[in-house]
Amino acid sequence: MSSADNLPEQETLSEDLIFDVLKNRRRRYTLHYLKQQDRPVELSELAEQVAAWENDTTVEGLSANERKSVYTSLYQTHLPKLADAGIVDYNQNRGVVELSGNAAQLEGYLRPQDEFPWIRYYLGLALTTASPR
């Protein structure tokens, strides 16, 4: 386990720490996926989904390099940082990660992530309703 094991379960996170953690898109994707799953997740599963979102494709459409790049950065950098902040429980030896109780403190800082890409919907709606002049 990471040094996050030494933190109290409900330690109050500072805004500076929250902003530092959330400034990276890969970490935001990680937190979103873990929240969706609401269970311990294997690192390989997490890496595949994050890579798919980053590359705007499906898990099946990923290349080996895309998978490996995300897996490596999650393993070496992002999950240890989230664990040290007390936001996830990360067992590096088993390759399993899940949200900790402190993750709830991030709710007000994260934009809601819907399954539907609303920006594309609104763009399509605007294009179809625009009248030519």
What do the PLM-derived regions correspond to, one by one?
Residues 41-50, 56-66:
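Short acidic, hydrophobic short linear motifs in intrinsically disordered regions
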Residues 65, 95-99:
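Glycine-rich loop motifs involved in handling phospho/adenylate chemistry
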Residues 79-93:
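A short, conserved structural fragment
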